[in-house]
Structure formats: structure tokens, C-alpha cells
Design a protein with these regions (language model features):
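Single conserved hydrophobic/aromatic residue that forms the stacking wall/gate
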Residues: 2-13
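Acidic, carboxylate-rich catalytic segments that either coordinate divalent cations
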Residues: 30-31, 39, 44-53, 57, ...
Length: 176
């Protein structure tokens, strides 16, 4: 189990959102052209471009569908930082993807419950603006989650490996 967790973690962050965004920056010529952005994201969902997995990384969450409350708070800080760092053009691209991706996902995947950016959508952009070396993105990603992962694992051990979601309320009797 540890092998898979550590291997997955090693691939997780840098390869997903930041590499996807770099790919979009390189292949979408006019970042302000909604149709061009939508067309490229459509090809991404169809598995024709980027890593060919048919995913738009940073979009969607297992529990939060209408919005990820963590992302809403984080985004306001990202906008201020982008303005202070002169990265408004990049921020506009993120905003465009945030607007277009849910429409495309609903259309192509027939997911109508709602899809929104998750908290990781902007994380790499922030690390980049702060001048943090890309080699540290994955450790930062992990550090931010270790307490939650640990608590989740303890709950799994006590709850017989049942999947636990944040919106659920435990009905188990308290253990003494």
C-alpha cells in the first residue's frame, strides 16, 4: 500500500495541473479567444491532446460539485497575487478555463450535477508566482494533506475500511 501511495504522490501534482496549464499556454495561441480555449479543452476531454487521458485537471471534486469552498477563498488571494506579480494574462486564462471546462464536461461526459475548480486548480500557479522551485510542488502538496490523510486512515481502521466523505455524519457508537 505504501508503494502505491508514494508512487502516486510522486506523479500527482507537477504532472497534472501545471503541465496541463503549460500545454495549454503553448498550444492555445489566443488565450482570450473563448472558442479557441473551448476547442482545445474539448480535444483534451476527447483524449487527443496533452496526456491523452481525457481529463481537465483541477476540475471536479468527489464531494463538492457546485463549488469547492476552499477554492473560492483561495482564488481571491490568487487574483491579488497575480495582479501584484503582473500575471493578469495568466489569471485570465485560468478564469477562462474555469468558465468553459464545466460546460464542456457537462456536454461531453453528461455530468449535470455541476463541476467546478477544486483547490488544486490554482496551487501550482501560486507556487510559480512565489518563485518556488517545481521540485518542491509535490512535497508542498503532500504537506498540506498529511494531517487529513492521517485522520482519514485512522477513521478507515476504526470504521472497517468504509469510505468516509466530509458531508457524512458518523452513526457509529463511540469507542471507549
Amino acid at each position: 500500500r505504501d508503494y502505491y501511495a508514494s508512487r502516486g504522490l510522486g506523479d500527482v501534482y507537477k504532472r497534472q495541473v501545471m503541465q496541463m496549464m503549460n500545454d495549454i499556454r503553448e498550444n492555445v495561441h489566443d488565450w482570450s479567444d473563448r472558442d479557441e480555449v473551448k476547442s482545445y479543452l474539448g480535444k483534451m476531454l476527447d483524449g487527443q491532446v496533452f496526456d491523452k487521458k481525457g481529463l481537465i485537471y483541477g476540475m471536479g471534486h468527489a464531494v463538492y460539485s457546485l463549488s469547492d469552498p476552499r477554492e473560492r477563498v483561495f482564488r481571491s488571494y490568487v487574483e491579488h497575487l497575480a495582479e501584484a506579480k503582473g500575471r493578469q494574462k495568466d489569471m485570465n486564462l485560468y478564469n477562462m478555463i474555469e468558465e468553459v471546462a464545466p460546460e464542456l464536461i457537462a456536454e461531453k461526459r453528461h455530468i449535470f450535477k455541476g463541476v467546478s475548480p477544486n483547490v488544486d486548480f490554482y496551487s501550482g500557479f501560486v507556487y510559480e508566482m512565489l518563485g518556488i522551485p517545481s521540485e518542491l510542488y509535490t512535497p508542498l502538496f503532500a504537506i498540506a494533506r498529511i494531517a487529513g490523510w492521517s485522520a482519514h486512515r485512522l477513521e478507515e481502521l476504526v470504521g472497517c475500511n468504509k469510505i468516509i466523505r466530509p458531508a457524512y455524519k458518523s452513526v457509529m457508537e463511540e469507542l471507549e
